[in-house]
């Protein structure tokens, strides 16, 4: 996965929900966080102390999970958030790691700016959950996430959708540099690589970022009510 973790906790340590687990030595500002509250019972290393796994014993009762506090914003306040604040929030919450670079699918360097951002809001894989169902109750957060992500770069942010998703997003208020592109057809028309080929392929002199619609919804929720980003049930 092109990273070198530096552990910030020891075995037996109490950990909080969304507490930093380790940064990446290659990009020290890129943080990976704990997905639950409990105790780090095992940190397994292999040859040359290569990190293999981290075992977390979650609280059994599931009540009153302690978590790292995050800033929340109203919708009008989000429209005025500067790019640096958005990046800081994504880095601290570990949602920055949901973004991938083209063509090598690495976690991007936050100090660099991509030429364009591509968001996949369709899935043509067999038996895959349809995006028209998954974000049905998350459309407002999907729109918020799109508008926040569009501030990360100066060029276009593309979101490719199927016909039904396109209908769900009509009459929504989007940033001026965001463009929706509808794709139709059987698999592999919903693959990120396939659509990138037509919209704007990556190259050695053209850095692009991409991510999926579920992560866009999570980003919208993170800045709205961060305590609900990871369910406690």
Regions found by a protein language model. Give the residues of each.
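Short, compositionally biased
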Residues: 29-45
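Histidine- and aromatic-rich ligand-binding microenvironments
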Residues: 1, 20, 31-34
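Short hydrophobic beta/alpha edge segments that flank linear recognition/processing sites
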Residues: 12-29, 52-60
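Short histidine-centered loop motifs in beta-beta connectors
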Residues: 4-14
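Alpha-helix N-cap/helix-initiation motif
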Residues: 7, 27-29, 135
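Short, structured beta-strand/loop micro-motifs enriched in basic residues and often containing a Trp
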Residues: 1-6, 23-24
């Amino acid at each position: 996965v092109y990273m070198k973790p530096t552990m910030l906790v020891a075995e037996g340590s109490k950990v909080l929900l969304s507490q930093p687990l380790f940064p990446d030595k290659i990009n020290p500002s890129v943080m990976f966080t704990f997905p639950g509250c409990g105790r780090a019972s095992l940190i397994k290393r292999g040859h040359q102390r290569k990190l293999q796994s981290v075992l977390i014993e979650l609280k059994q009762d599931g009540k009153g999970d302690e978590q790292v506090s995050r800033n929340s914003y109203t919708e009008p306040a989000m429209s005025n958030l500067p790019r640096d604040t958005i990046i800081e929030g994504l880095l601290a919450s570990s949602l920055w790691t949901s973004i991938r670079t083209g063509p090598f699918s690495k976690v991007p360097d936050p100090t660099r700016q991509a030429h364009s951002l591509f968001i996949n809001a369709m899935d043509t894989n067999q038996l895959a959950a349809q995006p028209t169902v998954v974000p049905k109750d998350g459309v407002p957060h999907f729109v918020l996430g799109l508008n926040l992500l569009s501030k990360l770069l100066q060029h276009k942010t593309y979101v490719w959708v199927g016909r039904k998703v396109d209908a769900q997003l009509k009459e929504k208020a989007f940033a001026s540099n965001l463009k929706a592109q509808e794709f139709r057809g059987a698999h592999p028309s919903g693959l990120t690589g396939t659509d990138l080929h037509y919209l704007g392929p990556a190259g050695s002199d053209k850095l692009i970022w991409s991510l999926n619609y579920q992560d866009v919804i999570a980003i919208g929720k993170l800045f709205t009510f961060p305590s609900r980003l990871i369910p406690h049930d």
